[in-house]
Structure formats: structure tokens, C-alpha cells
Curated annotation (Swiss-Prot):
Residues 12-75 form the SAM domain. CDD domains: PAP2_like, SAM_SGMS1. This is Phosphatidylcholine:ceramide cholinephosphotransferase 1. Its main location: Golgi. SUPFAM superfamilies: SAM/Pointed domain. The modification Phosphoserine is found at residue 13. It is a multi-pass membrane protein. Belongs to the sphingomyelin synthase family. It is found in: Golgi apparatus membrane. Major sphingomyelin synthase at the Golgi apparatus. Catalyzes the reversible transfer of phosphocholine moiety in sphingomyelin biosynthesis: in the forward reaction transfers phosphocholine head group of phosphatidylcholine (PC) on to ceramide (CER) to form ceramide phosphocholine (sphingomyelin, SM) and diacylglycerol (DAG) as by-product, and in the reverse reaction transfers phosphocholine from SM to DAG to form PC and CER. The direction of the reaction depends on the levels of CER and DAG in Golgi membranes. It is an enzyme of class 2 (transferase). The chain crosses the membrane at residues 141-161, 189-209, 220-240, 281-301, 309-329, 335-352.
Length: 418
């Protein structure tokens, strides 16, 4: 922030205050302080954060904002007292007429031989601040183990449920409105899986360039793990017949656990995809895992990429929508499988990020009904040290420098990580 701007801090408008809050990564205060001027801002005290609405914004009782305000006051004080000082002291000696009419005699106030006034200024120095967005890779590794465990459990559950699926000759497919209006397209499911792999690849590239990749990947693992855990439950409690007569399910093994283990390992190695030839079991219908990944990757891509890349968002949205439509067009899932998968995925993503972006929702209270979800304690553990909304910041994670092609831009969020 420039010195001229600091000099006028007391004259800041509410808009300038909001800009300062955004520049210092404190967007959560923009709404409660929307009518505050610069003078109101620097007059905030600890007592103000014990009363609404400020008491509901942050769990640190506004300490970070107060520290930033103290720094602001210090910079403002130094700027305001810079001019007219010599080495930090104001010269206040005055010339008085000498007996011969000249002005060579100086009055030395306070008895100081150099004519300077000794002034004591108390400037509170904020304590060294830890990162607002700590990486905490250990927590990320735990979240990864959780997601991996849920994925393995899902493959085990698919193998178990496969043994319970009734033969299509005994129990024909259930009626489905979409199937009544659209004939089956054989190659449609391959398009679905190709779109899914493209979205996962785009998300992986985007993740590599994210500055706060540890926090964001931790959120991804927590959400996708929970979604697959829910899927284990829904698959097990209700076994639906195959959606179409075209299904050729693997033979039942009737308790041969060694063969089942080999089949589970094959499914894990192939990523649970039909296009890799690893998934030829039946019964994993309610709800659709393909819909989960198509929806979740799009949501993360859009949430953690710049808003100006609207064309990128539309491309990813189109890949997701076409992929989901092709699931139904291939008659590989009932419509209810897709609807339930979309609903659960979007709700869990939005709930988790709403709670993560609001400090007050990270504290359990009678007013916070979201604290009653079963995964609230793990959520608190993973998110308690993340202060505020994670910026959509990017960096260059590789040792070689960025190659700029064409004209240079004035500003970019993509910088070298030095």
C-alpha cells in the first residue's frame, strides 16, 4: 500500500475499507463492516468483537483484524510524522535576535543541547502471525487414507452385492421413464467414462498449479470418501435388478473368497471403469459412482479456478452434463441412480464449503444445526486452522521458469514459487 494512501487512511470511504479487507484476505468482514469508514476502522477495539455482528464472524475474537489495524496505525503514524523530522526527531529550536542584530543564537528547549525535543512514542507491535492457510500435509495424508479406504470398501461391497443380484431372466429390469423415451445407445457409456477421465485429468493439472493444494485436496478427499461411503450403504441395503437385458454379469462365486479377492483387486486396478475391462459385476446401481465423479470434478474445477475463465467452466460443465446424459442413454443406470447421486454430491459439496468458509460454523453451538452432522468432528479437525475463504491463487510448482508466449500481461495470479 502506498504512503500517500496510508496518509489518508482516516478519510477512507467504506468502499476503500472493503478493498483493504479483500487485499488482506479478510473477506468475511466485508459484510459486517460495509458501512465503516477509515476512521471507524482504526477505532475498532477488542470490546467491539464481543458484540454482534462482529462476534459471529471469526473464532479468534477478531485478533487477526486488530493486529492488522495496529500495523495500519503504526504505518499511518510513521507517515504522518515523517515530514519535518530529522532522524526521527522534530527540530523545535528557534532563532532569536542576537545583540548585534543577527539571528545566530538558538533557544534550546528542555535543556537539550541539540535543540531537539525528546518524545516517547509507544507503538504496539503485533506478534508474529502464523500462516492463515497452513498446508498441514499430515492431515491431507489422513484424508487421502480415508478416501482410499472408502474406495476399497466400495469395491468389496460391489463384489458382495453382485452375489445377491437376481438373474435378469427371473427379475427383469424395472420400469424407467427415461428408458421409455430413449432407446439404448451401445457406445454411450464409453463416452461417459472418457468425459470422466478428461475431467479428472483437467482437475489434476489444475490442482498441481494451485498454491494451497494441500487444503483443497484435503477437502476433495474428505468429500469423495464420504460420498463413496454413502454409496456402500445404499448399494447394500437395496439391491436393484439390472437396468437392461444387455447386461452380461460375471458368474457368481458362491463363497469362493479367493476368487472374490482377485476380482476386487482387478476392479481396483482398473479404477472401477468398464472401458478398462475391470468392471463386469452387477448390483452397484443405487447410486451412480460415475455421476459422483462427473459432478464432483466439475464442482471443484469451477470453485477453485478464476471467475474470468468462464469458457473453461462451460467446457467442463458440458463434459459433465454430456457424460451424465450418456449414462442414461446407455441404460447402464436407472434414472433414480443418477438423480440421487447428483443430489447427494452437490449438497455435500455445498454444505462442506459453506461450513469451511464461515468461521462461526466451525464452532459447535445450539444455533449451529450443521454441527449435528456425523462428520462434524473430522471436519473441525481438518479445517480449524484455515482462516477464511481459501484464495484462488496459483503458483508454478516446477523448477524450470515459466515460458511466456506472446504479449506480456500486467498481472497474473500464476507466479514462480521462489
Amino acid at each position: 500500500m502506498s504512503a500517500s494512501t496510508m496518509k489518508e487512511v482516516v478519510y477512507w470511504s467504506p468502499k476503500k475499507v472493503a478493498d483493504w479487507l479483500l487485499e488482506n484476505a479478510m473477506p468475511e468482514y466485508c459484510e459486517p463492516l460495509e458501512h465503516f469508514t477509515g476512521r471507524d476502522l482504526i477505532n475498532l477495539t477488542q470490546e467491539d468483537f464481543t458484540k454482534p455482528p462482529l462476534c459471529r464472524v471469526s473464532s479468534d475474537n477478531g485478533q487477526r483484524l486488530l493486529d492488522m489495524i495496529e500495523t495500519l496505525k503504526m504505518e499511518h503514524h510513521m507517515e504522518a510524522h515523517k515530514n519535518g523530522h530529522a532522524n526521527g526527531h522534530l527540530s523545535i529550536g528557534t532563532d532569536v535576535p542576537a545583540p548585534d542584530g543577527s539571528f545566530s543564537i538558538k533557544v534550546k528547549p528542555n535543556g537539550m543541547p541539540n535543540g531537539y525535543r525528546k518524545e516517547m512514542i509507544k507503538i504496539p507491535m503485533p506478534e508474529p502471525e502464523r500462516s492463515q492457510y497452513p498446508m498441514e500435509w499430515g492431515k491431507t495424508f489422513l484424508a487421502f487414507l480415508y478416501a482410499l479406504s472408502c474406495f476399497v470398501l466400495t469395491t468389496v461391497m460391489i463384489s458382495v452385492v453382485h452375489e445377491r443380484v437376481p438373474p435378469k431372466e427371473v427379475q427383469p429390469p424395472l420400469p424407467d421413464t427415461f428408458f421409455d423415451h430413449f432407446n439404448r445407445v451401445q457406445w454411450a457409456f464409453s463416452i461417459c467414462e472418457i468425459n470422466g477421465m478428461i475431467l479428472v485429468g483437467l482437475w489434476l493439472i489444475q490442482w498441481l498449479l494451485l498454491k494451497y493444494k494441500s487444503i483443497i485436496s484435503r477437502r476433495f478427499f474428505c468429500i469423495v470418501g464420504t460420498l463413496y461411503l454413502y454409496r456402500c450403504i445404499t448399494m447394500y441395503v437395496t439391491t436393484l435388478p439390472v437396468p437392461g437385458m444387455h447386461f452380461n454379469c460375471s458368474p457368481k462365486l458362491f463363497g469362493d473368497w479367493e476368487a472374490q479377492l482377485r476380482r476386487i483387486m482387478k476392479l481396483i486396478a482398473g479404477g472401477g471403469l468398464s472401458i478398462t475391462g475391470s468392471h463386469n459385476m452387477c448390483g452397484d446401481y443405487l447410486y451412480s459412482g460415475h455421476t459422483v465423479m462427473l459432478t464432483l470434478t466439475y464442482l471443484f474445477i469451477k470453485e477453485y479456478s478464476p471467475r474470468r475463465l468462464w469458457w473453461y467452466h462451460w467446457i467442463c460443465w458440458l463434459l459433465s452434463v454430456v457424460g451424465i446424459f450418456c449414462i442414461l442413454l446407455a441404460h447402464d443406470h436407472y434414472t433414480v441412480d443418477v438423480v440421487v447421486a447428483y443430489y447427494i454430491t452437490t449438497r455435500l459439496f455445498w454444505w462442506y464449503h459453506t461450513m469451511a468458509n464461515q468461521q462461526v460454523l466451525k464452532e459447535a453451538s445450539q444455533m449451529n444445526l450443521l454441527a449435528r452432522v456425523w462428520w462434524y468432528r473430522p471436519f473441525q479437525y481438518f479445517e480449524k486452522n484455515v482462516q477464511g475463504i481459501v484464495p484462488r491463487s496459483y503458483h508454478w510448482p516446477f523448477p524450470w521458469p515459466v515460458v511466456h508466449l506472446g504479449r506480456q500481461v500486467k498481472y497474473s495470479r500464476l507466479v514462480n514459487d521462489t
